[in-house]
Amino acid sequence: EGEIHYGDSIAEGEGDKRYNVILTNPPFGTKGAGDVPNRDDFTIATSNKQLNFIQHVLTILKTGGRAAMVLPDNVLFEEHAGRDVRGLLMHDCQLHTILRLPVGTFTPYSAGVKANVLFFRKGLPTQEVWVYDSRTNVQKVNKGHPLDANYFQDFLKCFGARHTPRSQDRQESERFRKFTREQIRERDDNLDLFWLKDESLDDANELPEPEDLVGEAVTQLEVALDALNELAAQLGNGKKG
């Protein structure tokens, strides 16, 4: 039977426990953020909860272990600590797949939040990242169109049957693209990778819903707040020195 523990994974850590498989959807937003965790295993100091959860998973995942993390868009493009954590992830792990989730995935709780699933295996550095776009020009998830398995049938075919897919077993398609590590490095390790043109932007009748616009604004504000928190932490450390 599974065990459920109520606590603070970032503050408490896992001691010596290590895991073969980790599936996690860390809490989004900046609520509860502000303090930089005092953990020796975190090589990058940040108050961003999502970035710290990535570092936490890197610690507790066994070498050869597999993980899938649901993370908001800003984790893919945030600068400073965000860039450093993404670099660490791709150095320590084979980040082989990113799934861009449909708009409205978290309906009715946080309809405007845009998110992704990052799939990786610990032990080998990233050579290439395959991205599946299940968002652009895809029916938005809402009460009339709830999220179900049909949204991901094509992704599952593209992903393949292996736990850790091999590039030679995959083929690019309209929604599935490969990006080399060098291409990503040239983007300053920005993983916000997309190539399809959003047809809704050409149609005045298909403008984003208010909750989507609010979600976009919240994401940008969270990025700005994270940057300010990092600056405040740096200034605080400077005073102590």
Where are each of the predicted segments found?
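Short, conserved SAM-binding/catalytic segment
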Residues: 1
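A conserved structural/catalytic subdomain of Rossmann-like adenosyl-cofactor enzymes
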Residues: 6, 11-241
